[in-house]
Amino acid sequence: MSINFVGGDAQDSSMRMLQVVRSHTTSEFNANSTTYVSTMSCAITLRSSSSNCLVICQPVRLVMGGSTDGMYRLLNTTQGNTGMNVFRIAYAGSGYKNPTFIFNYGTALTAGNTYTFHLQGKTSTVDTNIIGDHGSTSSMTIIEYIS
């Protein structure tokens, strides 16, 4: 499959999508720690060494305590490194959220290797930080593409 971005701008380019993999979980993860805790995960076996991975994490809910900010990042457990983005979500008067986290990961990946990505979470203070919901489905999608 090819996707062509043809807006006429200099940053527009074509991209080739190689594969899409998806995982689902009905688990609830407690990330009420000031160090990162792994939560939902998804694995992909790459088809090309020229690939990037677009990783989309969609927890069905996020519950935070009133005295904390939640920090969320992507961990590549195969290589033991993290992506560049760290999302910070403030309590801001409501502890119930429904975020979508999108990470673009393209750090030295090798065709034929299987990479496992985890959404990790932590808190600024040790307070409630629950990702997911028992019985409801959260998902993680990885799109392998060449740009």
What kind of feature is each model-predicted range?
Residues 1-28:
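Glycine-rich, low-complexity segments
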Residues 36-39:
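Short, solvent-exposed loop/turn segments enriched in Ser/Thr/Gly
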